């Protein structure tokens, strides 16, 4: 998997994401955002959007009054970094997260995976459409909805293949929104962190346009220049030897 953790703490521009997808070997996942990223945070003391309760899941929702929080968002857990919700225990049962990510050419993406660590449950939406959930049985959970059961300790990362990503992604900027729920208000802990990856397959691979010097017999050879039909990366001399 391409290691983009450092740059994925902030939103990637469409051109950079497209370049990363194109440069990755066929079938290799590229990280769209990683663990420890910055999100927008709403503490679940009241509904995050009114009068349309579900507006918070949509790309055009105004979240300018939400806090900025680095994941993991948590309380009662032994973690390094992140954002601690010191006021959550016994006061509210949920929190909400939103962040943008870029997808410059959805038609080239063959799979997407959301990998999370969560305590207790969550439901994730992309551009207003549900794409993944865990430990939440309520069809449309609200800020006062409990998780269906407590998380199993110790917490482990779980992966969710997003089967309907092709129907919800748009070309360019997209928004993922997540509600995180505890089983009860007095739960001793809560946590959420996530990473989103995509696999892209190019329909037409790059071609070799010119080779200098041209093929033939040579008594000695110090350098060969190869020109491709488009920019490539990760190619060395061994890849070009017959």
Model-derived features: positions:
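Bacterial N-terminal signal peptides that target proteins for export
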Residues: 1-15
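Short, surface-exposed alpha-helix to beta-strand junction/turn motifs within ectodomains of secreted
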Residues: 223-242
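An acidic-aromatic loop/edge-strand motif
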Residues: 137, 146-201
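Surface-exposed, low-complexity/disordered Ser/Thr/Gly/Pro/Asn-rich loops and linkers
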Residues: 59-98
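Proline-enriched interdomain boundary motifs that mark the N-terminal boundary
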Residues: 204-211
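Bacterial N-terminal signal peptides
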Residues: 13-23
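Aromatic-lined ligand-binding clefts that engage carbohydrates, nucleic acids, or primary amines
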Residues: 39, 66, 93, 101, ...
